[in-house]
């Protein structure tokens, strides 16, 4: 198994410096990770640095709370695409999901998916599993699929918990082979990575990608 091709090499902390961003980009080239995942501010720099590479540029939309307006998310998505983003990881409106306002959740996702797909870019939907019941996780996955998303993703890594094998298993059971499943948050070792893949993840968001690749 080529673990590198599963990994979105991630640096989303707010205090990330240009030097650290450049290091992430260099590591992604060296290890041939699937992508780098960076905040929108760094997308243009990463896109220019990776233009002669197979490494994609992923960024985050409505991050990390998901509580911005749909119009703001769409603007953010379009700006990211203009700056060279290949994939968009958006956060759902968690509060509206928990309140049972599924139409609002659906239209929010659909708007970002429309913006992404208009430019042939993949959209992943972060459902923030640590804040949801299993019933809510299922609804979030169903709404993401209905909205036309390409992936469902467990976590931002900025809330109360990250990916679990149980959540990845549940999400895969809902979306079948129709959508991708991205596990993110708390994946620190090769064992963690392999467990998530075995549970059904076909992409991993991790800041520990180099450590994972170098572990025996």
From Swiss-Prot:
The reply to whether Lyase figures as a keyword in the UniProt entry is yes
Could you name the Gene Ontology cellular component terms for this entry? Answer: cytoplasm
SMART domains given in the database record: DeoC
Annotated active site: 89 (proton donor/acceptor), 153 (schiff-base intermediate with acetaldehyde), 182 (proton donor/acceptor)
Alphabetized GO MF terms: deoxyribose-phosphate aldolase activity
One GO biological process this protein is involved in is: 2-deoxyribose 1-phosphate catabolic process
Q: What Enzyme Commission number does this protein have?
A: 4.1.2.4
Q: Which domain of life is it from?
A: Bacteria
Signal peptide region: none
Subcellular localization is given as:
Cytoplasm
Its UniProt entry gives the catalysed reaction(s) as:
2-deoxy-D-ribose 5-phosphate = D-glyceraldehyde 3-phosphate + acetaldehyde
CDD domains (UniProt xref): DeoC
InterPro entries (alphabetical): Aldolase_TIM (IPR013785), DeoC (IPR011343), DeoC/FbaB/LacD_aldolase (IPR002915), DeoC_typeI (IPR028581)
Pathway it belongs to?
Answer: Carbohydrate degradation; 2-deoxy-D-ribose 1-phosphate degradation; D-glyceraldehyde 3-phosphate and acetaldehyde from 2-deoxy-alpha-D-ribose 1-phosphate: step 2/2
Q: What class of enzyme is it?
A: lyase
Which keywords, in A-to-Z order, does the entry hold?
Cytoplasm, Lyase, Schiff base
Q: What does this protein do?
A: Catalyzes a reversible aldol reaction between acetaldehyde and D-glyceraldehyde 3-phosphate to generate 2-deoxy-D-ribose 5-phosphate.
Which HAMAP family does the entry mention?
A: DeoC_type1
Q: Which family does it belong to?
A: Belongs to the DeoC/FbaB aldolase family. DeoC type 1 subfamily.
**Name listed for the protein in its UniProt record:** Deoxyribose-phosphate aldolase
What is this protein's gene name? deoC
């Amino acid at each position: 198994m080529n673990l590198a091709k599963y990994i979105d090499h991630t640096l989303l902390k707010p205090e990330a410096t240009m030097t650290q961003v450049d290091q992430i980009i260099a590591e992604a080239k060296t290890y041939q990770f699937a992508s780098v995942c960076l905040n929108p501010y760094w997308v243009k720099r990463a896109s220019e640095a990776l233009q002669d590479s197979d490494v994609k540029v992923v960024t985050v939309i409505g991050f990390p709370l998901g509580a911005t307006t749909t119009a703001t998310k769409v603007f953010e998505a379009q700006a990211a695409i203009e700056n060279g983003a290949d994939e968009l990881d958006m956060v759902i409106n968690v509060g509206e999901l928990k309140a049972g306002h599924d139409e609002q959740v659906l239209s929010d996702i659909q708007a970002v998916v429309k913006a992404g797909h208009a430019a042939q870019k993949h959209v992943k939907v972060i459902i923030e599993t640590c804040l949801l019941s299993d019933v809510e996780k299922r609804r979030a996955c169903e709404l993401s699929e209905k909205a036309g998303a390409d992936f469902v993703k467990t976590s931002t890594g900025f809330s109360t918990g990250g990916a679990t094998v149980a959540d990845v298993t549940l999400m895969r059971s809902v979306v079948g082979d129709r959508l991708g499943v991205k596990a993110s948050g708390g994946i620190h070792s090769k064992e963690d990575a392999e467990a998530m893949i075995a549970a059904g993840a076909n992409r991993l968001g991790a800041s520990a990608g180099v450590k994972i690749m170098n572990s025996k």
